[in-house]
């Protein structure tokens, strides 16, 4: 992988020291508080799943502990997040495997390897969609599904972008220097078009309203798309 500053080095570090439990619930919404759960992924019994941008591994750990998949591959490009996840939930191997790689890098060459791919404000948010979505479709088995949650609008209220362009958002390097990173906050119709152009069919969308009126509350856009059976 390229040697670049790990902009996720600090994210979730404090929580990892005080909360090591496998979550009892799976949430898609921005606040991780309400709305639909793992049922959106379908029947997971005996299925092979991949999480794109798995962070500390909490969603993947929940699925392994409560939904009996054959395997979950939890993929993250951040060295710190990968190490944190493995330290928290590595004991759930061999059904849970943490992979240190970028999402596009991991999916290339894995044609028809997965029944389900998902992302909870993960790699789909932080990877050029025109690079990620086609390889995600190819990595799914016929009839397989991709489900991801993303911001329905920018945190702070600015509308989502009307075309496939990224927004620069604040970030920090491991030594604390202030930099920026790219996040794709796209309008619903833009995501639908990007998915269809990447080979997906049956695209479904749902907007999950923000929980409460907190300063950083934001609506969630939940998208489900399928690789064609034929």
Model-derived segments and their meaning:
Residues 198, 213-230:
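Core SAM-dependent methyltransferase catalytic element
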Residues 201-211:
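Conserved S-adenosyl-L-methionine
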Residues 108-117:
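A short acidic, Gly/Pro-enriched loop at the edge of an enzyme's catalytic core
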């Amino acid at each position: 992988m390229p040697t670049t500053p790990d902009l996720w080095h600090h994210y979730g570090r404090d929580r990892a020291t005080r909360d090591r439990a496998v979550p009892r619930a799976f949430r898609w919404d921005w606040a991780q508080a309400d709305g639909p759960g793992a049922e959106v992924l379908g029947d997971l019994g005996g299925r092979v799943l991949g999480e794109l941008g798995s962070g500390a591994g909490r969603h993947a750990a929940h699925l392994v502990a409560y939904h009996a998949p054959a395997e979950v591959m939890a993929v993250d490009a951040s060295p710190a997040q990968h190490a944190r996840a493995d330290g928290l939930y590595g004991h759930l191997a061999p059904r849970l495997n943490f992979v240190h790689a970028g999402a596009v890098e991991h999916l290339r060459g894995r044609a028809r390897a997965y029944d389900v791919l998902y992302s909870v404000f993960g790699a789909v948010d932080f990877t050029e969609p025109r690079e990620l979505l086609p390889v995600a479709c190819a990595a799914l088995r016929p009839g397989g599904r991709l489900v991801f949650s993303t911001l329905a609008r920018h945190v702070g209220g600015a509308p989502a972008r009307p075309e496939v362009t990224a927004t620069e958002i604040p970030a920090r390097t491991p030594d604390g220097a202030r930099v920026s990173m790219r996040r794709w906050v796209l309008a619903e119709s833009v995501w639908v078009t990007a998915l269809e152009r990447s080979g997906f069919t049956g695209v479904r969308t749902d907007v999950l309203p923000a929980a409460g009126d907190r300063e950083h509350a934001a609506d969630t856009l939940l998208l489900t798309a399928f690789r064609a059976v034929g």
